[in-house]
Amino acid sequence: MAEEGEVSALVCDNGSGMVKAGFAGDDAPRAVFPSIVGRPRHTGVMVGMGQKDSYVGDEAQSKRGILTLRYPIEHGIVTNWDDMEKIWHHTFFNELRVAPEEHPVLLTEAPLNPKANREKMTQIMFETFNVPAMYVAIQAVLSLYASGRTTGIVLDSGDGVTHTVPIYEGYALPHAILRLDLAGRDLTDYLMKILMERGYSFTTTAEREIVRDIKEKLCYVALDFEQEMATAASSSALEKTYELPDGQPITIGNERFRCPEVLYNPSLIGMEAVGIHDTTFNSIMKCDVDIRKDLYNNIVLSGGTTMFPGIADRMTKEITALAPSAMKIKVVAPPERKYSVWIGGSILASLSTFQQMWIAKSEYDESGPSIVHRKCF
């Protein structure tokens, strides 16, 4: 266990899009790779090529031209446990090069996940990887830790799920947590669709990865959508070019801000949900009237989908319009927010006060997977 001080805990933030893994106490994850398992589309014909039946992470990404890529985590929930096991195996043995039976492991999950999801995670860690101890933490809570606060509302938006989690004095307020199954992957799909209207066809799982890259490099959030649309229509100042892997350039104009606009107006993709600003506001309104002021003043952005330029200004504008007029609104967008869940996990797992919180293997052997609900909130 961690008391001796030599053995550091492992922190593994399994996102729908990327796995962030490393050692507790470090200030950044050692390994960041896509949560992808790829399988060959065609059978191998070359003798001695040593073809594998599956590839994980970056290797799957680099061979994507011949593979079908699958993400085992959808909307923050593991949908394919065999593939998930491959990802964990890859994380421990290939990326971090550690023996999991020697280190406590801190895992993360989305709030409001099905109970069975955490139980299965717990079971695989103890039974397949023989870890000595483990813990499952809520992603948004870790992000708040990383920002150095104990009170605030975290808007955490990754590749698969977005949620707003109000936290007061270190406690998440479960009744006020809201979840929106709209995140980065949906934006990528929408960008594929609107690029199609421009005459660029992206259809395969491999081509989706190209569009994701376009999204990450060129998209931004407009402060005023209508005004930006007018600007885009009247001049080509907003146009940018992107070079495809085969050298062909494509031009992208109003798609740059139309894509992330979905976050504020999900009806653009036919979703009946309200936008991230309304979700944040609704979440605050579900909290006790006495603590709302502290939440308005500490709106913390977290996750890769909050990395769009202009998102904090737009968020401030939208929340200001919804909140009482004299209310002080502060949106915090830490530069490292893409990894703030992992960083918070690194901080938590290295606290001396946390060491009694781990679920030990002996406790698991006694109580089974359901122990996770008693020990982890």
Curated annotation (Swiss-Prot):
PROSITE patterns: ACTINS_1 (PS00406), ACTINS_2 (PS00432), ACTINS_ACT_LIKE (PS01132). GO terms for cellular component: cytoplasm; cytoskeleton. It catalyses: ATP + H2O = ADP + phosphate + H(+). It is found in: Cytoplasm, Cytoskeleton. GO terms for molecular function: ATP binding; hydrolase activity. It holds the Pfam family Actin. Keywords: ATP-binding, Cytoplasm, Cytoskeleton, Hydrolase, Nucleotide-binding. InterPro entries: Actin (IPR004000), Actin/actin-like_CS (IPR020902), Actin_CS (IPR004001), ATPase_NBD (IPR043129). SUPFAM superfamilies: Actin-like ATPase domain (SSF53067). It comes from the Eukaryota. Its EC number is 3.6.4.-. Belongs to the actin family. This is Actin.
